[in-house]
Design a protein with these regions (language model features):
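Mature, structured domains of secreted/extracytosolic soluble proteins
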Residues: 1-188
Length: 188
């Protein structure tokens, strides 16, 4: 079946209602003091696009911290991570306004996304100032070019491919493009 992308609640309430995917994300938002932003209560930014960090990415970051030689940077829970670092991570994933998949330009098929001749896609600038390219890419179906599914993909000049999961989740104050569980926190 087809599920509806629309949710009759703000972004925070949407994520609070899906603890499997977003429990640690919600904890990070609250710890960073950014709850108002994700609830649509910031006057200058009532609508946002969140390139959604799944809980598994945060969990991996916490586990990976145990490999650090610097014991002051070993975390066992979200609240152990410095608030400023949580804030930095989150703002690297938030864009002002609502950017839907249909608002993103297609990739020029003649070039790979990172090649100099690439003139497709849409450059995204996040609140932390980092930039990446979002692009749509069609697929073939039954041998017919571009007759299949259209995917939203992202590529970072610093980190390469940004794994996507589910685009266009639409709570009342913006849109969430959920990143894949394999996403490494901060690699955007």
């Amino acid at each position: 079946g087809v599920s509806s992308p629309y949710h009759d609640c703000n972004m925070m309430d949407y994520m609070r209602g899906d603890t499997y995917n977003w429990e640690l994300t919600v904890q990070m938002i609250e710890h960073a003091g950014l709850t108002d932003l994700f609830e649509g209560k910031v006057d200058t930014m009532p609508v946002i696009t969140f390139w959604g960090i799944p809980s598994y990415s945060i969990q991996r970051f916490i586990f990976d911290s145990h490999e650090n030689e610097d014991l002051t940077k070993v975390y066992t829970k979200v609240s152990d991570i410095p608030k400023s670092l949580c804030r930095e991570f989150l703002l690297k994933h938030v864009t002002k306004g609502k950017i839907l998949k249909e608002d993103i330009a297609y990739k020029n098929k003649e070039f790979e996304i990172n090649e100099s001749g690439q003139d497709g896609g849409t450059w995204i600038t996040c609140l932390a100032g980092n930039r990446f390219i979002a692009y749509r890419e069609g697929s073939d179906y039954a041998g017919v070019p571009d007759a299949g599914e259209v995917n939203l993909r992202c590529w970072s000049p610093s980190w390469g491919k940004i794994p996507m999961s589910s685009p266009d989740i639409q709570p009342t104050n913006g849109v969430v493009h959920a990143l894949n569980y394999s996403y490494r926190l901060g690699h955007i």
